[in-house]
UniProtKB/Swiss-Prot annotation:
Belongs to the universal ribosomal protein uL4 family. Pfam families: Ribosomal_L4. SUPFAM superfamilies: Ribosomal protein L4. It comes from Clostridium acetobutylicum (strain ATCC 824 / DSM 792 / JCM 1419 / IAM 19013 / LMG 5710 / NBRC 13948 / NRRL B-527 / VKM B-1787 / 2291 / W). Part of the 50S ribosomal subunit. One of the primary rRNA binding proteins, this protein initially binds near the 5'-end of the 23S rRNA. It is important during the early stages of 50S assembly. It makes multiple contacts with different domains of the 23S rRNA in the assembled 50S subunit and ribosome. Residues 45-76 are annotated as: Disordered. The keyword Protein biosynthesis does not apply. This is Large ribosomal subunit protein uL4. GO terms for cellular component: ribonucleoprotein complex; ribosome. The keyword Ribonucleoprotein applies. GO terms for molecular function: rRNA binding; structural constituent of ribosome.
Amino acid sequence: MPTVEVFNKEGKKVEDIELSEKVFGAKISESALHQVVVAQLANKRQGTQSAKTRTEVSGGGIKPWRQKGTGRARQGSIRAPQWIHGGVVFAPKPRDYRISIPKSMRRTAMLSALTSKVNDKEMIVLDELKIDAPKTKEIVKMLNAFEAKKALIVVAESDQNVYKSVRNIQGAAVIPANNLNVYDILKYDKFIVTKEAVSKIEEVYA
């Protein structure tokens, strides 16, 4: 079983805990990680881009001058793409970029991401993270104690005081354990998770 140290907010070691082998000691699948991250990024896209083709722009399709005898290049329509106010060639249209990923692959990717953080010594377990009132200074102090410039903080339950304390810090984010996803785990250098949140993660994936 993987063993990690538990720290307090000041960065001092409190104890050691054993993690679930199934969750934090799984075999890493780089292909699953890649496919799930690509799918997550694709699913974030709005897909609302749109432009008009030559058949959709306003104005008539009148032929600007006769075909022969003017000395100028032949033109068929004043709404052809090469004209000002003309239509767009192969104009983008609204589309759905969503990629469906099998549940088993999502699970494999999640376990791979969690295991990689343990293997790379990038997972930091906190005994608790309680703040009486929103205070960015407290979170900054904690991040400095762990030398964490880019960190994902995972809490057991959504906490407005913690959320408001973190939201103004560039390079840091907070997320409840039930919203944990592969992209966010890999995006940040440090994976800071409370002891209670670890239990929740193991409860879901063990």
